[in-house]
Amino acid sequence: GGGGGGYRGSSVQGQIEYSRTFGKHDVNALFVYHQKEKVDNQPANDEYKVLPYREQGLAGRFTYGYDSRYLMEFNFGYNGSENFISGRRFGFFPSIAGAWVVSGEPFWEGIRSKVNLLKIRASYGLSGNDYLADSSNNIVRFPYLTTVNMNKALYVWFSPNFVKQTGHEIKTVGNPLATWEESTKLNVGLELGLFDALTLNVDVYKENRTGIFMQRRSLPLTMGLSGVTPYGNLGEVENRGARV
């Protein structure tokens, strides 16, 4: 455990690693478990900041290579977030990647002095985000909970002298279906090396983000929630591009 920067906390981490080379085969595996908790020492009258931040997860990586020419990697994360209701807290996020070092092939020998590297690679993966934010970019904790203002002063119609009375008011509407924002990304790349002096990397990618946490535009007035519009995993964005 430790403190600093306004927080105190504790963490636990353990890992198991395996590595072996036999002949032209290289095999590596890694599994990591982590658990973390931190508490804000200065909650600033925010009832949510009084509560500890907790996260838990298991991650793994497996790599295989043959003769430094054919490469494969598989990763996964199984992560738990306190931000979501029981049954929706854990997400599984895998990815896979492969590469072919063409310049390592015997038929490349004749031009290796000019083109010393040609590597083709591709990857596809799913990632998740549990740090949700509202329209003002404030971090939202426990979006599945409805919050109530117990001391809202409101004018009461037909009351003596039309005075304000203290009552209850819904501040935020909880969404029990709130869960991880997800992103899938496909990447295809090429690495080219010339004369052992010049290197060129080219990547083409496509990314789809789904379940983006955002506010609904409107609700029926019959719900009695005028001015309080709930959030949900509603948004989608697609990005395409290239990097050199």
Question: What does each model-found stretch correspond to?
Answer:
Residues 1-244:
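Extracellular/periplasmic, surface-exposed regions of secreted and cell-surface proteins
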